[in-house]
């Protein structure tokens, strides 16, 4: 078992709240990611057979991706992916052996150059390799990727949701606080092992985000309609 974290904007979290509370995650097309070189690879046009290249491109199109991180306290990731610390970070407890058969979970490899075509690998093996390889400037993210092949749905069971961390700018009086009210309402009906709720905060000149568990006063003062 391991802990993985997913940074989300408040809107995305709210739109899929029931699924997230059930330990499900959603996939996206890798073409929608913020890296303009996502999925790129190098081949030599006059040496590498075109039909092999086309097969790899076809295999890449069969995959959708969901992105995670091993850390919840990375300041830049909160800034990039949670709308300036106004969103959330979800904490999942995950076991690879419990994933659906058409899914794979791997750490991203970071390299100085783009990956190259390799005739010793199948088209599917190369497609997966290219989708979990990024250039070194992205290494600070420490990303893990869940790849789903030929999915019939856009969400799959991933693991147990063990924590929800609300961003440092998720303050009382902010209109986003309605989501926290909804979360408290939902987890009160979950029974055993509900996720722990945390509030992220930034202290002084500390380089990392910190968090505290909501105390009894915090939880009681949230009015649930």
Where are these regions (language model features)?
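Partner-binding and oligomerization surfaces adjacent to conserved cores of proteins
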Residues: 1-225
């Amino acid at each position: 078992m391991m802990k993985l974290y997913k940074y989300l904007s408040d809107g995305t979290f709210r739109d899929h709240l029931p699924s997230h509370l059930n330990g499900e995650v959603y996939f996206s097309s890798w073409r929608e990611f913020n890296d303009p070189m996502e999925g790129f690879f190098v081949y030599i046009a006059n040496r590498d057979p075109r039909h092999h290249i086309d097969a790899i491109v076809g295999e890449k199109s069969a995959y959708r991706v969901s992105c995670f991180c091993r850390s919840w306290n990375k300041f830049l990731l909160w800034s990039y992916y949670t709308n300036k610390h106004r969103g959330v970070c979800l904490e999942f407890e995950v076991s690879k052996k419990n994933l659906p058969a058409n899914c794979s979970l791997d750490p991203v490899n970071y390299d100085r150059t783009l990956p190259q075509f390799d005739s010793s690998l199948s088209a599917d093996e190369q497609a997966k390799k290219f989708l979990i390889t990024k250039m070194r400037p992205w290494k600070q993210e420490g990303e893990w990727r869940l790849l789903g092949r030929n999915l019939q749905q856009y969400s799959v069971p991933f693991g147990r949701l063990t924590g929800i961390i609300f961003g440092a700018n998720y303050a009382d009086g902010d209109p986003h606080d309605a989501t926290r009210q909804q979360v408290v309402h939902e987890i009160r009906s979950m029974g055993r092992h509900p996720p722990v709720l945390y509030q992220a905060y930034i202290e002084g000149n500390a380089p990392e985000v910190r968090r505290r568990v909501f105390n009894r006063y915090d939880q009681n003062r949230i009015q649930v309609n």
